[in-house]
A protein has these predicted regions:
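Short, intrinsically disordered/low-complexity patches at protein termini
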Residues: 92, 152, 156-157, 230-232, ...
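HotDog/MaoC-like acyl-thioester-processing domains
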Residues: 1-26, 115-209, 282-335
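Hot-dog-fold acyl-thioester-processing enzymes
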Residues: 2-117, 183-268, 333-335
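Short flexible/disordered coil segments
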Residues: 88-89, 93, 127, 275, ...
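Catalytic-pocket segment enriched in acidic/His residues
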Residues: 245, 252-297
Length: 335
Protein backbone atom coordinates (compact mmCIF):
# COMPACT_ATOMS: atom_id res chain seq x y z
CA UNK A 1 0.00 0.00 0.00
CA UNK A 2 1.47 3.36 -1.01
CA UNK A 3 1.56 6.51 1.07
CA UNK A 4 -0.40 8.34 -1.63
CA UNK A 5 -3.23 5.84 -1.34
CA UNK A 6 -3.20 6.13 2.44
CA UNK A 7 -3.30 9.93 2.40
CA UNK A 8 -6.06 10.02 -0.20
CA UNK A 9 -8.21 7.65 1.81
CA UNK A 10 -7.68 9.63 5.00
CA UNK A 11 -8.63 12.84 3.20
CA UNK A 12 -11.88 11.25 2.08
CA UNK A 13 -12.71 10.18 5.63
CA UNK A 14 -11.62 13.53 7.11
CA UNK A 15 -14.21 15.27 4.95
CA UNK A 16 -16.83 13.76 7.27
CA UNK A 17 -15.46 15.35 10.45
CA UNK A 18 -18.20 17.28 12.24
CA UNK A 19 -20.89 15.75 10.04
CA UNK A 20 -23.46 13.12 11.04
CA UNK A 21 -22.17 9.64 10.25
CA UNK A 22 -25.65 8.61 9.11
CA UNK A 23 -27.53 10.31 6.29
CA UNK A 24 -30.82 8.86 7.53
CA UNK A 25 -30.95 10.98 10.69
CA UNK A 26 -30.60 10.03 14.36
CA UNK A 27 -30.91 6.39 15.37
CA UNK A 28 -34.20 5.75 17.14
CA UNK A 29 -34.37 3.06 19.82
CA UNK A 30 -36.42 0.07 18.60
CA UNK A 31 -38.00 -0.14 22.06
CA UNK A 32 -38.53 2.04 25.08
CA UNK A 33 -36.48 1.30 28.19
CA UNK A 34 -38.08 -1.85 29.57
CA UNK A 35 -37.74 -4.47 32.29
CA UNK A 36 -37.14 -7.53 30.06
CA UNK A 37 -34.04 -6.00 28.46
CA UNK A 38 -32.78 -4.81 31.84
CA UNK A 39 -33.34 -8.31 33.24
CA UNK A 40 -31.41 -9.88 30.35
CA UNK A 41 -28.52 -7.50 31.01
CA UNK A 42 -28.29 -7.99 34.78
CA UNK A 43 -28.60 -11.76 34.41
CA UNK A 44 -25.84 -11.89 31.78
CA UNK A 45 -23.52 -9.80 33.97
CA UNK A 46 -24.80 -11.15 37.31
CA UNK A 47 -25.37 -7.55 38.45
CA UNK A 48 -27.69 -7.68 41.46
CA UNK A 49 -28.04 -3.96 42.19
CA UNK A 50 -31.67 -3.83 43.41
CA UNK A 51 -32.47 -0.45 41.80
CA UNK A 52 -32.51 -2.19 38.41
CA UNK A 53 -35.34 -4.66 39.08
CA UNK A 54 -36.77 -4.30 42.61
CA UNK A 55 -39.51 -1.69 42.26
CA UNK A 56 -40.31 -1.54 45.98
CA UNK A 57 -36.67 -1.02 46.93
CA UNK A 58 -35.96 1.42 44.10
CA UNK A 59 -38.89 3.58 45.22
CA UNK A 60 -37.07 4.24 48.51
CA UNK A 61 -33.87 5.48 46.83
CA UNK A 62 -32.84 8.78 45.29
CA UNK A 63 -34.08 7.41 41.94
CA UNK A 64 -37.70 7.01 43.07
CA UNK A 65 -38.20 3.90 40.96
CA UNK A 66 -36.52 1.31 38.77
CA UNK A 67 -33.72 2.64 36.55
CA UNK A 68 -31.65 1.04 33.80
CA UNK A 69 -27.98 0.17 34.39
CA UNK A 70 -26.06 3.21 33.13
CA UNK A 71 -23.68 1.18 30.98
CA UNK A 72 -26.69 0.05 28.91
CA UNK A 73 -26.92 3.53 27.33
CA UNK A 74 -25.58 2.45 23.94
CA UNK A 75 -27.62 -0.75 23.96
CA UNK A 76 -30.99 0.98 23.66
CA UNK A 77 -30.30 2.44 20.21
CA UNK A 78 -28.42 -0.53 18.75
CA UNK A 79 -30.02 -1.24 15.39
CA UNK A 80 -32.01 -4.39 14.73
CA UNK A 81 -29.53 -6.71 13.01
CA UNK A 82 -29.74 -8.13 9.52
CA UNK A 83 -28.06 -11.45 10.28
CA UNK A 84 -27.50 -12.46 6.65
CA UNK A 85 -24.12 -11.12 5.59
CA UNK A 86 -23.21 -9.73 9.01
CA UNK A 87 -19.75 -11.35 8.98
CA UNK A 88 -18.93 -9.78 5.62
CA UNK A 89 -19.94 -6.41 7.09
CA UNK A 90 -17.59 -6.89 10.04
CA UNK A 91 -20.48 -7.11 12.47
CA UNK A 92 -22.43 -4.06 11.31
CA UNK A 93 -26.16 -4.53 11.89
CA UNK A 94 -27.05 -3.39 8.38
CA UNK A 95 -25.47 -2.35 5.11
CA UNK A 96 -22.80 0.33 5.48
CA UNK A 97 -23.15 3.10 2.85
CA UNK A 98 -20.16 3.03 0.54
CA UNK A 99 -19.51 6.77 0.89
CA UNK A 100 -19.71 6.80 4.71
CA UNK A 101 -16.51 6.97 6.83
CA UNK A 102 -16.61 3.26 7.68
CA UNK A 103 -17.69 2.33 4.17
CA UNK A 104 -14.72 4.19 2.70
CA UNK A 105 -12.32 2.41 5.04
CA UNK A 106 -13.87 -0.98 4.33
CA UNK A 107 -13.56 -0.39 0.59
CA UNK A 108 -9.91 0.51 1.11
CA UNK A 109 -9.27 -2.90 2.65
CA UNK A 110 -9.48 -1.82 6.30
CA UNK A 111 -12.23 -4.27 7.20
CA UNK A 112 -11.01 -5.23 10.69
CA UNK A 113 -12.63 -3.44 13.62
CA UNK A 114 -11.41 -3.22 17.21
CA UNK A 115 -12.80 -0.93 19.91
CA UNK A 116 -10.02 0.86 21.82
CA UNK A 117 -11.52 3.66 23.92
CA UNK A 118 -14.88 4.61 25.39
CA UNK A 119 -15.91 7.65 27.41
CA UNK A 120 -19.47 7.55 28.72
CA UNK A 121 -21.20 10.52 30.37
CA UNK A 122 -24.55 10.20 32.11
CA UNK A 123 -26.77 13.25 32.64
CA UNK A 124 -29.34 11.07 34.39
CA UNK A 125 -30.26 7.42 34.73
CA UNK A 126 -32.86 6.12 32.31
CA UNK A 127 -36.33 5.24 33.54
CA UNK A 128 -38.85 2.74 32.27
CA UNK A 129 -40.64 4.14 29.24
CA UNK A 130 -37.83 6.43 28.06
CA UNK A 131 -37.45 6.25 24.27
CA UNK A 132 -34.01 7.32 23.13
CA UNK A 133 -32.49 8.72 20.00
CA UNK A 134 -28.79 8.99 19.26
CA UNK A 135 -27.04 11.33 16.83
CA UNK A 136 -23.47 10.41 15.92
CA UNK A 137 -20.85 12.70 14.37
CA UNK A 138 -17.30 11.92 13.29
CA UNK A 139 -14.72 13.65 15.50
CA UNK A 140 -11.35 12.56 14.11
CA UNK A 141 -9.37 10.06 12.07
CA UNK A 142 -5.69 9.40 12.69
CA UNK A 143 -2.87 9.05 10.24
CA UNK A 144 -2.31 5.50 9.07
CA UNK A 145 -0.67 3.55 11.91
CA UNK A 146 1.20 0.26 12.09
CA UNK A 147 0.25 -2.02 14.99
CA UNK A 148 0.53 -5.72 15.75
CA UNK A 149 -2.81 -6.18 14.00
CA UNK A 150 -1.65 -4.49 10.82
CA UNK A 151 -1.94 -1.07 9.19
CA UNK A 152 -4.98 0.96 10.08
CA UNK A 153 -6.66 4.12 11.29
CA UNK A 154 -8.03 5.17 14.66
CA UNK A 155 -11.50 6.60 14.12
CA UNK A 156 -13.33 8.56 16.82
CA UNK A 157 -16.95 9.64 16.92
CA UNK A 158 -19.29 11.20 19.48
CA UNK A 159 -22.86 10.00 20.04
CA UNK A 160 -25.37 12.22 21.84
CA UNK A 161 -28.38 10.50 23.40
CA UNK A 162 -31.66 12.33 23.91
CA UNK A 163 -35.04 11.38 25.37
CA UNK A 164 -38.56 11.99 24.03
CA UNK A 165 -38.36 15.61 25.13
CA UNK A 166 -35.03 16.10 23.29
CA UNK A 167 -33.20 16.49 26.60
CA UNK A 168 -29.66 15.11 26.57
CA UNK A 169 -29.42 12.04 28.83
CA UNK A 170 -25.87 10.99 27.95
CA UNK A 171 -22.94 11.08 25.56
CA UNK A 172 -20.32 8.66 24.38
CA UNK A 173 -16.97 9.30 22.76
CA UNK A 174 -15.97 6.07 21.04
CA UNK A 175 -12.74 5.13 19.28
CA UNK A 176 -12.11 2.11 17.09
CA UNK A 177 -9.15 0.84 15.10
CA UNK A 178 -10.00 0.02 11.47
CA UNK A 179 -7.25 -2.21 10.11
CA UNK A 180 -6.23 -4.54 7.31
CA UNK A 181 -6.57 -8.04 8.82
CA UNK A 182 -3.42 -10.16 8.65
CA UNK A 183 -3.52 -13.93 8.67
CA UNK A 184 -0.10 -14.19 10.34
CA UNK A 185 -1.07 -12.30 13.48
CA UNK A 186 -0.97 -14.01 16.85
CA UNK A 187 -2.48 -11.22 18.90
CA UNK A 188 -2.31 -11.13 22.66
CA UNK A 189 -2.93 -7.44 23.19
CA UNK A 190 -5.54 -6.42 20.68
CA UNK A 191 -2.90 -4.46 18.78
CA UNK A 192 -2.83 -1.74 21.41
CA UNK A 193 -0.15 -3.02 23.75
CA UNK A 194 -0.43 -2.64 27.48
CA UNK A 195 -2.79 0.13 28.50
CA UNK A 196 -1.34 2.69 30.90
CA UNK A 197 -1.98 2.12 34.58
CA UNK A 198 -4.19 4.54 36.45
CA UNK A 199 -2.07 6.93 38.48
CA UNK A 200 -2.33 5.61 42.04
CA UNK A 201 -3.90 7.86 44.63
CA UNK A 202 -4.25 7.82 48.39
CA UNK A 203 -7.57 6.33 49.41
CA UNK A 204 -9.67 3.29 49.92
CA UNK A 205 -8.95 0.22 47.86
CA UNK A 206 -11.88 -1.73 46.47
CA UNK A 207 -11.90 -5.46 47.12
CA UNK A 208 -10.69 -7.37 44.05
CA UNK A 209 -13.24 -9.13 41.88
CA UNK A 210 -12.29 -12.13 39.74
CA UNK A 211 -14.36 -12.89 36.66
CA UNK A 212 -13.88 -16.36 35.18
CA UNK A 213 -14.25 -15.47 31.51
CA UNK A 214 -15.81 -18.28 29.47
CA UNK A 215 -17.35 -18.43 26.01
CA UNK A 216 -20.74 -18.21 27.70
CA UNK A 217 -19.76 -15.02 29.54
CA UNK A 218 -18.55 -13.44 26.29
CA UNK A 219 -21.58 -14.46 24.22
CA UNK A 220 -24.14 -13.66 26.94
CA UNK A 221 -22.78 -10.13 27.30
CA UNK A 222 -22.78 -9.56 23.55
CA UNK A 223 -26.38 -10.73 23.14
CA UNK A 224 -27.61 -8.79 26.20
CA UNK A 225 -26.07 -5.64 24.72
CA UNK A 226 -27.54 -6.40 21.26
CA UNK A 227 -24.07 -6.63 19.69
CA UNK A 228 -24.08 -9.31 16.99
CA UNK A 229 -20.52 -8.74 15.76
CA UNK A 230 -19.20 -12.25 14.92
CA UNK A 231 -15.92 -11.67 16.79
CA UNK A 232 -17.90 -12.01 20.02
CA UNK A 233 -19.40 -15.44 19.24
CA UNK A 234 -17.66 -16.94 16.18
CA UNK A 235 -14.15 -18.20 16.99
CA UNK A 236 -13.13 -18.67 13.36
CA UNK A 237 -14.10 -15.09 12.56
CA UNK A 238 -12.33 -13.74 15.65
CA UNK A 239 -9.06 -15.56 14.96
CA UNK A 240 -9.25 -14.43 11.35
CA UNK A 241 -9.23 -10.86 12.66
CA UNK A 242 -6.07 -11.56 14.68
CA UNK A 243 -7.66 -12.28 18.07
CA UNK A 244 -6.75 -15.41 20.06
CA UNK A 245 -10.43 -16.35 20.52
CA UNK A 246 -13.86 -14.76 20.75
CA UNK A 247 -13.48 -11.71 22.96
CA UNK A 248 -15.63 -9.57 25.24
CA UNK A 249 -17.24 -6.52 23.63
CA UNK A 250 -16.76 -3.05 25.06
CA UNK A 251 -20.39 -2.75 26.19
CA UNK A 252 -19.94 -5.81 28.39
CA UNK A 253 -16.63 -4.50 29.70
CA UNK A 254 -18.30 -1.21 30.63
CA UNK A 255 -21.09 -3.19 32.26
CA UNK A 256 -18.67 -5.10 34.46
CA UNK A 257 -16.84 -1.88 35.36
CA UNK A 258 -20.18 -0.37 36.38
CA UNK A 259 -21.10 -3.47 38.38
CA UNK A 260 -17.71 -3.56 40.12
CA UNK A 261 -17.93 0.05 41.28
CA UNK A 262 -21.60 0.02 42.30
CA UNK A 263 -21.17 -3.28 44.16
CA UNK A 264 -18.69 -1.36 46.30
CA UNK A 265 -20.50 1.97 46.50
CA UNK A 266 -24.04 0.62 46.98
CA UNK A 267 -27.40 1.11 45.26
CA UNK A 268 -27.57 4.86 45.99
CA UNK A 269 -24.51 5.45 43.81
CA UNK A 270 -25.10 7.34 40.58
CA UNK A 271 -22.38 7.09 37.97
CA UNK A 272 -21.51 10.28 36.11
CA UNK A 273 -18.80 8.96 33.80
CA UNK A 274 -17.07 5.74 32.77
CA UNK A 275 -13.85 6.45 30.86
CA UNK A 276 -11.78 3.45 29.79
CA UNK A 277 -8.99 2.40 27.49
CA UNK A 278 -8.84 -1.17 26.22
CA UNK A 279 -5.67 -3.22 25.99
CA UNK A 280 -5.40 -7.01 26.06
CA UNK A 281 -8.57 -8.86 25.06
CA UNK A 282 -10.81 -10.58 27.60
CA UNK A 283 -11.01 -14.10 26.19
CA UNK A 284 -12.18 -17.52 27.42
CA UNK A 285 -9.80 -19.34 29.72
CA UNK A 286 -8.26 -16.24 31.29
CA UNK A 287 -9.51 -14.97 34.65
CA UNK A 288 -10.10 -11.22 34.60
CA UNK A 289 -9.24 -9.53 37.91
CA UNK A 290 -10.82 -6.14 38.67
CA UNK A 291 -9.11 -3.83 41.15
CA UNK A 292 -9.82 -0.24 42.11
CA UNK A 293 -8.83 2.62 44.35
CA UNK A 294 -10.44 5.92 45.32
CA UNK A 295 -8.24 8.55 43.67
CA UNK A 296 -10.30 11.68 44.24
CA UNK A 297 -13.13 13.04 46.34
CA UNK A 298 -14.92 16.35 46.76
CA UNK A 299 -18.19 17.74 48.11
CA UNK A 300 -20.92 19.23 45.96
CA UNK A 301 -23.72 20.39 48.20
CA UNK A 302 -25.20 17.36 49.93
CA UNK A 303 -23.30 14.87 47.78
CA UNK A 304 -19.86 13.34 47.67
CA UNK A 305 -18.29 13.17 44.22
CA UNK A 306 -15.90 10.23 44.15
CA UNK A 307 -13.40 9.28 41.46
CA UNK A 308 -12.33 5.66 41.32
CA UNK A 309 -9.37 4.42 39.32
CA UNK A 310 -10.06 0.94 37.95
CA UNK A 311 -8.05 -1.79 36.30
CA UNK A 312 -9.02 -5.20 34.98
CA UNK A 313 -6.19 -7.51 33.95
CA UNK A 314 -5.56 -11.09 32.92
CA UNK A 315 -2.44 -13.07 32.07
CA UNK A 316 -2.30 -11.32 28.69
CA UNK A 317 -1.98 -7.87 30.31
CA UNK A 318 -4.27 -5.00 31.21
CA UNK A 319 -7.66 -5.51 29.57
CA UNK A 320 -9.00 -2.14 30.66
CA UNK A 321 -7.82 0.83 32.69
CA UNK A 322 -9.65 4.03 33.42
CA UNK A 323 -11.74 6.01 35.86
CA UNK A 324 -15.31 6.09 37.09
CA UNK A 325 -16.82 9.23 38.61
CA UNK A 326 -19.87 8.74 40.82
CA UNK A 327 -21.94 10.64 43.35
CA UNK A 328 -23.34 9.50 46.68
CA UNK A 329 -25.62 11.26 49.14
CA UNK A 330 -23.37 12.20 52.06
CA UNK A 331 -25.21 9.95 54.50
CA UNK A 332 -24.73 6.96 52.19
CA UNK A 333 -21.15 7.58 51.07
CA UNK A 334 -19.00 4.46 51.11
CA UNK A 335 -16.01 4.80 53.38
Amino acid sequence: MTGARTDHLREQVEAWIGRPMSTSGPAVAPDAVNLPMIRHWVDALDDRNPVYLDEAFAATTRFGGVVAPPAMLQTWTMARPQIDGIAARGGAAGEIPADSPLGLLNAGGFTGTLATNSELEFARYLRLGDRLQSATALESVSECKATALGLGYFVTWVSTYTDDGQAVVGRQRFRIYKFEPRNDVSATSGGRGRAPSVEPGVGEELAPFDLDVSSTVVVAGAIASRDFMPAHHDRAFATGQGAPDVFMNILTTNGYVSRYVTDWAGPEAMLRTISVRLGAPAVPGYVLRFTGRVVGERREGSERVIEVGIRAANDLGDHVTGTVVLTLPSANAAS
